[in-house]
């Protein structure tokens, strides 16, 4: 969503600046990913995918326009439109999304929405108490555990990993904010690659007590061409707290943070209910060089859980593992442990090391005898070169257990390297 504060006077693509902070600007983002792997699908890619997957590249080019115009009482009309040219080439991606397609190139509209903010019109309720928007746009809740990305990527749309398609086919959103309380009313329709669309309507509530505690939830109902989704009601509750900071506890324990989310999916017509949840603890060593942050997360999704519209908000959330979570297993019928260590050796560079352990929640339902699936190690180096250019280097190694060998037919360690770059104006 466009904010006037995002319009910097130095933006080389800004072509209009009004006296009241109104603006209009062109936007441009270019993303490129280079991928190489060894022993993909644990050495059995040809049987699992129909052909080998060794290396490939992806790119997207996203030109667009953004604007904001201020009215009396600091009311604001804003909007955005952009298109995405997505490409995959050089080989079969690790998900085989371009199987039988070869090199893929696809151009289509991504975002196209407009909105209005109330400014000081309801001054007693706070600045921008009301925000109404409609059109092709992305609706994000929390860290993307449930609602984040609504359009399919890969296949004949190209760029499977970069994922240039995230906006809903249509979304109408009413946001209300006063003090620490945020209430959203939302209706949207997703934009899948298949013709099986899903409509979602409901409400999201979040209350932030202060920097140390928040709680939120949502209630949504679905109308879908997919039988197991049609008529489903979704209940979501989530929260985060720094318990020792909130209680003015010992100084050394104040950086400790606990986050959790639980989703229950209630179905009719003989379909079983689904449940997914996680609990995450993290601690930042604020007085130590490089300010390391150590995180542990346990996540569990039963065999009836529908991942709906989860997405990538950060490394590991909610694609769990740069091999397993990206290409092999989604967030259903899966239990996982994650340990993450993140350090910042100097300001523009962050280094993250991940360990994952994956087990199948119900091995029989998955079609294997052993629920132990795989372990994975990931190394991610992020470099913010400047305000416009960022680079990431990813190295990953997935080591199969008996469940993965039974599932894929392979028993070799799967290695993976990716170089990603983004230029954004």
Set out the residue ranges of the language-model regions.
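Active-site beta-strand termini and strand-to-loop segments that position acidic
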Residues: 117, 207, 241
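A general secondary-structure junction signal
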Residues: 83, 136, 298-300
């Amino acid at each position: 969503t466009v904010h006037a504060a995002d319009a910097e006077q130095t933006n080389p693509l800004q072509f209009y600046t009004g006296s009241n902070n109104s603006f209009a600007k062109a936007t441009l983002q270019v993303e490129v990913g280079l991928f190489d792997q060894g022993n993909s699908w644990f050495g059995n890619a040809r049987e699992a995918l129909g052909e080998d997957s060794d290396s490939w590249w992806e790119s997207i080019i996203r030109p667009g326009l953004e604007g904001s115009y201020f009215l009396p009482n600091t009311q604001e009309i804003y909007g955005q439109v952009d298109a995405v040219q997505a490409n995959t080439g050089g080989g079969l991606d690790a998900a085989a999304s371009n199987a039988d397609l070869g090199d893929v190139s696809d151009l289509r509209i991504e975002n196209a929405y407009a909105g209005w903010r109330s400014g000081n019109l309801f001054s007693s309720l706070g600045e921008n108490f009301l925000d109404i928007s409609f059109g092709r746009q992305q609706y994000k809740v929390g860290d993307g555990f449930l609602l984040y990305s609504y359009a399919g990527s890969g296949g004949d749309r190209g760029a499977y990993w970069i994922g240039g398609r995230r906006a809903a086919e249509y979304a109408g959103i009413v946001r209300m904010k006063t003090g620490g309380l945020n209430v959203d009313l939302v209706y949207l329709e997703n934009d899948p690659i298949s013709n099986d669309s899903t409509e979602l309507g409901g409400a999201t509530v979040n209350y932030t007590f202060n920097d140390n505690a928040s709680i939120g939830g949502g209630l949504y109902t679905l109308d879908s061409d997919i039988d197991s989704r049609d008529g489903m009601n979704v209940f979501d509750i989530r929260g985060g707290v720094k318990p020792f900071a909130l209680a003015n506890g010992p100084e050394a324990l104040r950086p400790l943070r606990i986050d959790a989310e639980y989703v229950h999916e209630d179905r009719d017509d003989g379909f079983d209910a689904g449940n997914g949840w996680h609990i995450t603890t993290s601690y930042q060593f604020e007085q130590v060089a490089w300010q390391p942050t150590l995180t542990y997360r346990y996540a569990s999704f039963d065999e009836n859980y529908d991942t709906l519209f989860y997405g990538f908000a950060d490394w590991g959330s909610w694609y769990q593992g740069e091999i397993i979570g990206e290409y092999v297993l989604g967030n259903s019928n899966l239990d996982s442990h994650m340990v993450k260590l993140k350090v910042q050796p100097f300001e523009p560079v962050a280094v993250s090391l991940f360990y994952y352990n994956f087990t199948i929640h119900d091995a029989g339902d998955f079609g294997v005898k052993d629920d132990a699936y795989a372990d994975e190690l990931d190394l991610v180096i992020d470099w913010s070169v400047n305000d416009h250019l960022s680079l990431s280097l990813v190295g990953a190694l997935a080591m199969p257990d008996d469940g993965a060998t039974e599932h894929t037919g392979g028993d070799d360690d799967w290695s993976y390297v990716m170089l990603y770059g983004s230029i954004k104006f």
